[in-house]
Amino acid sequence: MAGMVLGVGAGVFLLALLWVLVLLLCVLLCRASGIARFSIIFVFLGALIITTVLLLFPRASEFPAPQGEMKIVDAFFIGRYVLLAFLSAVFLGGLFLLLTHHVLEPIYAKPLRSC
């Protein structure tokens, strides 16, 4: 099942791209004048024919072939913990700087009388 994104294959994205382009072309051709305005019908019918061909003649079977047991290996194990340690140190350093520069900032009293 190569090429699966969000549980759907490349054909769904191909159809979505086709219809987005057809919609864009139809909007652009609506502004045209003369005989070019009527070419919207041919663009729409062409997209409809391409869609029916892609839907009626699928390349893969509907049910995927059973696969063997997959072993999941975490190849980025050490890098993930190094990144976690680095981000934790930056977070703690930021909290320390926030504490020293913002929270513990001294507030000086104003003199009551000026002599």
Swiss-Prot record:
InterPro entries named among the record's database cross-references: Tmem218
A single GO cellular-component term on record: membrane
Transmembrane segments: 5-25, 38-58, 81-101
Membrane-protein topology: Multi-pass membrane protein
Disulfide-linked positions: none
Keywords for the protein's UniProt record, in alphabetical order: Cell projection, Membrane, Transmembrane, Transmembrane helix
Record's subcellular location: Membrane; Cell projection, Cilium
Family as reported in the entry's similarity comment: Belongs to the TMEM218 family.
Role of this protein: May be involved in ciliary biogenesis or function.
Quaternary context: Interacts with TMEM67.
Name used for this protein in its record: Transmembrane protein 218
Protein species of origin: Rattus norvegicus (Rat)
Lineage: Eukaryota, Metazoa, Chordata, Craniata, Vertebrata
Gene behind this protein: Tmem218
